[in-house]
Amino acid sequence: MSKNMEYRKHRIEYLRTTVEYSLFGGEGGTREAHLMFHVDPEAGSYEEQLTAIRKAYHRILSRKVKIRGMVPVFCRYFLSDAANQWEALQAVLQKEPSCAVSVVQQPPLDGSKIALWVYLTSEPNAAYKHYLSLIHI
């Protein structure tokens, strides 16, 4: 593993959520991070799992020193039943700061109803907003 790449796994027990993240760059250059949020399959209904994922997302972004200050470029939600889950997700997303969002109907392999992949960077780039500004289903 390169000295410019770091992989971590963090468990948030009270949310029954695991976050895996890889950090790239540093030392004066642009930093990038890929975060993957998983919720335990038995963590309740879709709405409860969505709430747990969003709380974990905010907790990690505000508390992890190496991620703090980074800007989300895009979020990709993996849903088990996008047609029936989209409305609840859309209601949550309208209340939060925007970044490009995509939704994929691909059930998470662990059997949960939702998973989230987030790409962050330390230096926002206007090109990202231009190319990644639409919500895709």
Regions found by a protein language model. Give the residues of each.
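Short, charged, solvent-exposed linker or helix-capping segments at domain edges/interfaces
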Residues: 126-132
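Short, well-ordered amphipathic alpha-helical segments that serve as non-catalytic structural scaffolds
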Residues: 17-18, 45-65
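N-terminal basic/disordered segments at the start of proteins
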Residues: 6-29
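A structural signal for the main folded, soluble domain(s) of proteins
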Residues: 10-12, 35-38, 48-54, 121
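Conserved small/polar residues in nucleotide/adenosyl-binding loops
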Residues: 135-137
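Short, low-complexity cationic-aromatic patches
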Residues: 25-29, 61-72, 107-112
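Short, conserved loop-to-beta-strand elements that form functional interface hotspots
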Residues: 8, 12, 73-121
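Right-handed parallel beta-helix/beta-solenoid
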Residues: 28-45
